[in-house]
A protein has these predicted regions:
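A glycine- and small-aliphatic-rich helix-loop capping segment at beta-alpha/alpha-beta transitions
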Residues: 23, 99-111, 128-134, 186, ...
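Conserved beta-alpha
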Residues: 49, 113-124, 139-151, 175, ...
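A glycine-rich beta-strand to alpha-helix segment
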Residues: 70-125, 130, 166-182, 193, ...
């Protein structure tokens, strides 16, 4: 059966601007062919089995020649694959999507075009520049500064463009900005016309500088701006200082590494992005089944013998009930057991299953959990099931046993080091570094150190800051002779995000 090619616009850079249709197609892609300006965070939406092919497309960057790329798309589809051709912005706006579609039609390959949000409108918006405004202009013109180099003559009518009222938006014009400004001036546009240049628009690296047509080239050189840059020419560019919302957020300009598992990173990453940070998701752990499930089966079979089940993580809740419902159909088979949850995320997971929680310690540590349980009742001969990770810290079961409890410490899952870099974030970190690294568990500290040499990196980059979610994580950092820059007062994801803002 013949496959299909989807020409998908990835948007201008902010991963949140991908369309719902684009996200849906990535989730079922067999092959993804992506360009340089695509936010590689989007690649993580695809299944782990998806073949990833880098197409290049940046100036002076190694790329698959367009003709070869066209053939590749057709070949993969003919082989029965679902192919997503992921292109920055919109496929049909200065993206050669039309050429790719034409080749697919010639080859008889089915295709679909999924429009994307173009940098033409998105980047000025993120810089506080409306392209139209009742007080300034009612139209805008879009210009490419990078025409086909094989053309004998420019297709751009500079006389008409200069005289055209309204805003002018220039894409891909960095290398020729001096010539473009001169052409506009020569054809009648005032050298005093306001202008703005936005680099890496809609991303955490966004920078905006203002100028006039006459000073564009000088200001560009001073700022050492390199592609990608969107240039806006016209009176609306004067509004950027007043209307700029994106660059005014508390963590703007900060690159923050999130080390949680891919499944768990979403909430923290989302909060940090909302606060303006550029987030690099580098999972350090992956959740896998435990070494043996025999102890699990034994504990589930005898579930009615326990007085308490203690969960220390949402993962523990999830994996416990996965096993439980394989053995039982009815939650009432839990009997009269009581539930304790360490931390609000753990409690939330239990409540999602409509489980009433009998005990939540005020602080989220082993010592606090043991004390809370002891305050609740005498623990002599009380039977406790600890449903948690393999090789977890032994402090909690030891403290409970010291008070006479009978503890079964059962591993319902195991964490292993994550080494894959599906979204390119690890490569980005290695190349450009970061301002912050956030840690939400001791294992994330140890695995990050094993992969990147955390202690050495902190020594080499003294401005690198470390954020810990709580005492157990801080303890793991101290074992490496490292001290966190900040520790969350509330030992939750919310607390971790909040402490970065306060710092």
């Amino acid at each position: 059966m013949k496959g299909k090619v989807y020409l998908v616009g990835a948007g201008p850079g902010d991963a949140g601007l991908l369309t719902l249709r684009g996200a849906e197609l990535l989730r079922r892609a067999d092959v993804v062919v992506y360009d340089s300006l695509v936010n590689r965070e989007l690649l993580a939406l695809a299944p782990e089995s998806t073949e990833m092919i880098f197409g290049g497309k940046r100036p002076r960057e190694r790329a698959i020649p367009q003709e070869e790329l066209n053939r590749l798309l057709a070949e993969k589809a003919v082989a029965g694959k679902t192919v997503v051709r992921l292109k920055g912005g919109d496929p049909y706006i200065f993206g050669r999507g039309g050429e790719e579609a034409a080749e697919l039609r010639r080859e008889g390959v089915p295709f679909e075009v999924v429009p994307g949000i173009s940098s033409i409108i998105a980047v000025p918006s993120y810089a506080g520049i409306p392209l139209t405004h009742r007080d300034h202009c009612s139209s805008f013109t879009v210009i490419t500064g990078h025409e086909d180099p094989d053309k004998d003559k420019s297709a751009l009518d500079w006389d008409r463009i200069a005289r055209e009222p309204g805003t002018k938006v220039l894409l891909m014009g960095v290398e020729h900005i001096g010539k473009i400004a001169a052409a506009l001036e020569t054809n009648g546009l005032s050298a005093d016309t306001p202008a703005a240049m936005i680099r890496w628009g809609t991303t955490g690296r966004q920078q905006t500088i203002t100028a006039t047509v006459g000073t564009l080239a000088d200001e560009l050189a001073k700022a050492d701006f390199k592609a990608p840059v969107v240039t806006v020419i016209g009176r609306v560019s004067t509004l950027c200082d007043t209307l700029n919302w994106f660059e005014n957020r508390p963590l703007f300009g900060q690159r923050v590494v999130v080390t949680r598992t891919r499944a768990e990173a979403g909430k923290l990453s989302g909060q940090l992005r909302d606060l303006g940070a550029e987030v690099l998701e580098i999972p350090t752990i992956r959740i896998v089944p435990p070494t043996s499930n025999a102890p699990i089966i034994e504990s589930i079979t005898g579930i009615g013998n326990y007085d308490w089940i203690i969960f220390t993580s949402a993962n523990g809740v999830e994996h416990f009930f996965d096993y439980f419902f394989k053995a039982f159909r009815d939650v009432r088979d839990l009997g009269c057991v009581r539930f304790a949850a360490v931390g609000p995320a753990t409690a939330k997971k239990l409540r999602e299953l409509h489980i009433n929680i009998d005990l939540i310690p005020e602080t989220y540590t082993a010592k606090a959990a043991a004390k809370a349980l002891l305050d609740f009742q005498n623990l002599e001969n009380v039977s406790v099931l600890l449903a948690r990770a393999e090789a977890a810290n032994t402090e909690l079961p030891r403290l409970l046993e010291d008070q006479g409890a009978i503890v079964d410490d059962i591993a319902f899952y195991k964490t292993v080091p994550e080494t894959a870099d599906r979204n390119g974030a690890a490569e980005e970190f290695e190349t450009y570094g970061a301002d912050w690294i956030t840690f939400a568990s001791g294992s994330s500290v140890r695995n990050f150190d094993a992969r990147f040499g955390l202690a050495n990196r902190c020594a080499d980059y003294p401005d690198l800051k470390l954020a810990s979610i709580g005492p157990e994580t801080t303890k793991a950092l101290k074992e490496l002779d490292l001290k966190p820059t900040v520790e969350a007062r509330e030992h939750t994801v919310d607390g971790l995000a909040a402490v970065l803002v306060k710092k």
